């Protein structure tokens, strides 16, 4: 089983990926991204989907028009792992590249 992030690793992650919040009901992080329109949101989701498939680590997400809600957690570890941290970093880059607000 993959180890979950320790407290220092979590602090470092939150410093790198602003706006993500720890969910109170489980060991997962969440963030909402807003884009100019549906095409921009879908383009962002496509970039994330390709990376997630390469990593074999998939987000939980929900999309309505220009908004994308993303939750990350490693189900096998029952919590946050380095895979969530790596994907969150990529998601931040992808969001900036597609004009997220």
UniProtKB/Swiss-Prot annotation:
Work out whether the entry's keyword set contains Methyltransferase.
no
The broad enzyme category this protein falls into is: lyase
Q: Which UniProt keywords apply?
A: Lyase
Q: Name one GO molecular function term.
A: 4-alpha-hydroxytetrahydrobiopterin dehydratase activity
The family line of this record is: Belongs to the pterin-4-alpha-carbinolamine dehydratase family.
Task: Tell me which PANTHER family the record gives.
Answer: PTERIN-4-ALPHA-CARBINOLAMINE DEHYDRATASE (PTHR12599:SF0)
The molecule here is called Putative pterin-4-alpha-carbinolamine dehydratase
């Amino acid at each position: 089983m993959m180890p979950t992030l320790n407290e220092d690793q979590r602090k470092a992650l939150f410093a790198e990926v602003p706006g993500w919040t720890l969910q109170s009901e489980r060991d997962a992080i969440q963030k909402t991204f807003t884009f100019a329109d549906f095409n921009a949101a879908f383009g962002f989701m496509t970039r994330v989907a390709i990376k997630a498939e390469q990593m074999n680590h998939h987000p939980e997400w929900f999309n309505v028009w220009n908004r994308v809600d993303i939750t990350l957690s490693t189900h096998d570890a029952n919590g946050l792992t380095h895979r969530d941290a790596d994907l969150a970093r990529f998601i931040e880059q992808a969001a900036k590249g597609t004009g997220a607000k």
